[in-house]
Structure formats: structure tokens, C-alpha cells
A protein has these predicted regions:
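Long, low-hydrophobicity, acidic/polar, solvent-exposed interaction domains
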Residues: 1-159
Length: 159
């Protein structure tokens, strides 16, 4: 995805308070009838990022002014093409629990991937370590997108 028109930028900033890591959300520019581009500090862990994304998705869905054609995108710096690139995630449903499915690929913070796949027709779920940085998450998302996998669930599990 290269060019997005009619969008609102949403920023999630990295902040600290003593030894605590915090996320600061700048949602003042979020217009529910537009496409939303999420610019997220790569140092933030998923355990802080995902609850904020869930809240913002719910706000957009509940708006009387939402557009049925508007999308949500993560932005990232594409170092190969030297530009800002986007990953769509409008249909993605984040779950803050471990999956009940028998078909899951789990990506850990230390770079390991574990899979438990059954020979069935159920969609394969993706799971991510809640302590993984957003940068690591985006790197996995880019790799998964390039594989053009079929039958991947629209739910992602962060645990």
C-alpha cells in the first residue's frame, strides 16, 4: 500500500515515568469518517499498544459519522524503498487472551516461532508475545504479508 487519501493520523508515543513505560495517545486528529493511519513508537510493547488500538477501533465503529469504506493502517519506515509504508488492519480483531484454537503460530519476543497446526479447515490464528516491541511485531507482520498465506484468522492473540 503506497498512497492513502483522506486520512487522520493517530500517534502513540513512548513515555516513561520512573521505571514505568507508558503510552501516550494523541487522538485529537481522529475523524471517524476518514482512513486512520497509526504511527506507533517502535519501542512500545504490545501489552501497552493493543489496548489503546482496541479502544480506538471501538470508538470508530461506534461513531455515527463513520464511513463504511474507511480503513485502518499501521505505518512503518520501509528501508528498502526508503519511504513510509502501510499495513492495513481494519478487519483485524485483537484478543488479549491465549487462543482456544488448535491451529496457531506463536511469535515470541526472543525471535522464536512456535506452531501447533492441525489438519483441518479452521483458519490459522496468529499469536504474539505481549512483551514484544511494536517494531518486532511489524517485522513479523511484513514477513507474514510477503508469504501471502491463505486461511489466516482475522483474530490475533496477544498474550
Amino acid at each position: 500500500m503506497k498512497d492513502i487519501q483522506d486520512y487522520s493520523s493517530i500517534y502513540l508515543f513512548f513515555r516513561t515515568n520512573g521505571k514505568d513505560t507508558l503510552v501516550e495517545v494523541n487522538r485529537k486528529n481522529s475523524i471517524s469518517s476518514t482512513n486512520w493511519i497509526f504511527h506507533i513508537d517502535k519501542r512500545l510493547p504490545l501489552r501497552l499498544v493493543v489496548p489503546e488500538i482496541i479502544k480506538l477501533q471501538a470508538k470508530k465503529e461506534g461513531s455515527a459519522h463513520k464511513s463504511e469504506t474507511s480503513e485502518n493502517y499501521f505505518s512503518y519506515s520501509d528501508s528498502v524503498h526508503k519511504n513510509l509504508a502501510f499495513i492495513p488492519f481494519t478487519k483485524l480483531q485483537f484478543k488479549l487472551t491465549s487462543p482456544k484454537s488448535d491451529s496457531i503460530v506463536y511469535f515470541s519476543k526472543n525471535g522464536d516461532a512456535f506452531h501447533k497446526l492441525k489438519n483441518n479447515t479452521a483458519a490459522t490464528g496468529l499469536g504474539f508475545d505481549k512483551n514484544m516491541s511494536f517494531e518486532e511485531y511489524i517485522q513479523y507482520k511484513i514477513a507474514i504479508q510477503q508469504l501471502n498465506l491463505q486461511n489466516v484468522s482475522e483474530a490475533e492473540f496477544i498474550y
